[in-house]
A protein has these predicted regions:
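Alpha-helical transmembrane segments in inner-membrane proteins
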Residues: 1-327
């Protein structure tokens, strides 16, 4: 376990440095890194500080958060098919962003789009908790999340269908594909408190998630407050997923696939999977973001498209291996 964590941490650092040096400009890696710490305000220094550094930081923050949220959600529901968007936060955040684009709020305010997405995420969480009720179990939480997610998706489609501005509709579609391009340090400071707060909350649930592997009755016998655990899970996941969707758009499969890949390596304890999934999620999103810039540098290839193209076949392969092992 210790060796695995060291290896994952080293990969995060290496990919972070690589992300800082990859771009359309033909500049040597040593020059790029030197420009980052330059006291001046030259073109390369501005590119490093205002474009590449925020992008690299967001890949680590968002990828790590989604991986952690996915592991926590799977541990709580005791379902390896669970993922962070199951409680409807990402769909609600997307609806808020779509409304901001369609009404012109995104164009009139610098942070209008991410703030509207965060407002949508908070509204979605409130509705999910209201529907699930204070005493509802995990099944009630899933059903409430599916209902809110379906409603938000339907309203998003309605806004797209009725949008009088074809350019706004086009912007909405491209935003929903997910991207870290054209992000600044403002976006980093916007998502950071939500991601850190959500991560801190989810990491405290490790002992409770371990107890849940024995069943809800056994966990309650061991002194676990399941209602409190569910509330903390929803709040932590909502902070991470809402902030990530607000800044980067819809990025899927990280919270679903990464815990699957790492679970055989860390064992059956959900608490041990939390940290590993956070590092694994950061690695996966950094790799995807680097691939976006390398594969088609002249085209605006969207990050969410790459994560889906890689994550879906990988997930199918994991399902096939699991089914084969049970045969």
């Amino acid at each position: 376990m210790t060796r695995l964590m060291i290896a994952l941490s080293a990969m995060v650092v290496v990919l972070f440095l690589l992300s800082l040096t990859v771009g359309p400009a033909d500049v040597r890696p040593t020059e790029s890194l030197a420009a980052l710490f330059d006291d001046g305000y030259g073109p390369l220094t501005l590119v490093m500080r205002e474009i590449r550094l925020p992008r690299a930081l967001l890949a680590v923050i968002i990828g790590g958060g989604l991986g952690l949220a996915g592991a926590a959600m799977q541990g709580y529901l005791r379902n390896p098919l669970a993922e962070p968007g199951l409680i409807g936060v990402s769909s609600s955040a997307a609806l808020g962003a779509v409304l901001a684009i369609n009404t012109g709020l995104a164009a009139s305010l610098t942070l209008g789009l991410p703030l509207a997405a965060l407002a949508g995420a908070l509204a979605g969480v409130f509705l999910v908790m209201a529907l699930a009720g204070p005493q509802g179990g995990s099944l009630t939480l899933i059903l409430a999340g599916i209902a809110i997610s379906a409603m938000a998706a339907a309203l998003t489609s309605l806004v797209l269908n009725l949008s009088p501005n074809p350019f706004a509709a086009n912007e909405i579609v491209f935003w929903m594909m997910g991207s870290l391009a054209d992000r600044s340090m403002l976006h980093v400071w916007l998502v950071l408190p939500f991601a850190l707060t959500g991560a801190a909350i989810l990491l405290t649930l490790g002992r409770g998630l371990d107890a849940l592997t024995l069943g809800e009755d056994a966990a309650q016998t061991m002194g676990m407050n399941l209602n409190r655990m569910r509330l903390l899970l929803v709040i932590g996941t909502a902070g991470i997923v809402g902030g990530a969707t607000a800044v980067a758009g819809a990025i899927g499969f990280i919270g679903l696939v990464v815990p699957h890949i790492l679970r055989p390596l860390v064992g059956g304890q959900p608490s041990r999977l939390l940290w590993a999934s956070a590092l694994g999620g950061a690695i996966m999103l950094q790799l995807a973001d680097i691939a976006v810039r390398v594969i088609l540098p002249s085209r605006d290839l969207k990050l969410g498209v790459v994560t889906a193209l890689v994550g879906a076949p990988l997930f199918l392969h994991l399902i096939y291996k699991t089914r084969k092992g049970l045969a």
